[in-house]
Amino acid sequence: MSSDEKLQILYCSFCGKSQHQVRKLIAGPAVFVCNECVDLCNDIIREEEIAQAGGAQKKLPTPPEIHRMLDEYVIGQEFAKKVLSVAVYNHYKRLGNQTKKDSVEISKSNILLIGPTGSGKTLLAQTLAKILDVPFAIADATTLTEAGYVGEDVENIIQKLLQKCNYDVEKAKTGIIYIDEIDKIARKTDSPSLTRDVSGEGVQQALLKLIEGTVASIPPQGGRKHPQQEYLQVDTSNILFICGGAFADLHKIIQRRTDKSGIGFAAEVRPKEDFSREASKLIKQTEPGDLIKYGLIPEFVGRLPIITTLEELDEDALMRILTEPKNALVKQYRKLFEFEGVEIDFREDALKAIAKRAIQQKTGARGLRSIVEHTLLDLMYDLPGVAAGLRKVVIDSGVIDQASPPIFIYHHEKASRKVAQE
């Protein structure tokens, strides 16, 4: 290489690498910096910011404060909110005092939520993570299998949590993981299985160590595991696990234990609503032994010492869910219609009709959005084209029941019914 060619080669003023050794070289007044040095500087600044944030920890809200914040997003379920507020407060109080040397070591208390579909189990867990500003991940127990079998490995749950916090291991250690449909991995009988149960008892065994606390080896950035790879080591001892499930027919096991109701010819004949109310009362009496009879192994039940139940939402609760929370469905659709310069008004009879349909479909609060979305589909499809001159749209029970179209109120009219164009 000639001396002239050497003079033409540019070098990073910080690491000394040439322009051929790096992807990009940025020029400044008499200096050059490469992309690798820029990335390194960003990493140093990010680490300092994390350290400063860790040093100035936010004040942990008290149980009543947590309860009040849950009230802003979750309607009803007062007992469950109280239990969760205390459990979460104690968990993070325990984490905040771990550095202090003390002879008493406080064990982690994971939580089991029992309640019908759409009663608010997932929302409660999500809202807790939002209140406490900690990473949160959801896993579906029905997709999990033992390691080595086709399906999702239980350690993938930790990977989901890492993804939520940009693979910050220290932050992930303080997160919350919600495992839904936990009742679906119950074994069929309460006696040990003689055959391999890949998605039932086997998954419970695989989850045991993870929930209690172990060091999980997770591939970086979501890659697949292979022998030559360096893994991220994540200690799960401080991760709060909340498990949830409907536990259908659990009340029958509790009924046999408590022997509250007669059977056979002497049994009292009661309406369907009474059976539902009685089942709800029985579920509140759930004990660890009932869960073992249901099909959860004793060791797994032992890792979930806090058990709380959620009630089935009635019509009044569903109507309140539509309007009261910060992110209530009615408020969301009002905002969507505001973007088009149109006001939308849901009358009380419409809210009642939506709630009734959700109860009929047995979807609880989870089904409310799909009912409203289906009802407003044609209207939202045509709205951008007809919004000019339109001031207000009124939704009543007739619209929900598909018996009549919405009421359109124009700026120059009082009220008229218009059929959305098909």
Swiss-Prot record:
The keyword Repressor does not apply. GO terms for cellular component: HslUV protease complex. GO terms for biological process: cell division; proteolysis involved in protein catabolic process. ATP binds at P116, T117, G118, S119, G120, K121, T122, L123. The keyword Secreted does not apply. Residues 1-53 form the ClpX-type ZB domain. SUPFAM superfamilies: Glucocorticoid receptor-like (DNA-binding domain), P-loop containing nucleoside triphosphate hydrolases. It comes from the Bacteria. PANTHER family: ATP-DEPENDENT CLP PROTEASE ATP-BINDING SUBUNIT CLPX-LIKE, MITOCHONDRIAL, ATP-DEPENDENT CLP PROTEASE ATP-BINDING SUBUNIT CLPX-LIKE, MITOCHONDRIAL-RELATED. ATP-dependent specificity component of the Clp protease. It directs the protease to specific substrates. Can perform chaperone functions in the absence of ClpP. This is ATP-dependent Clp protease ATP-binding subunit ClpX. It comes from Coxiella burnetii (strain RSA 493 / Nine Mile phase I).
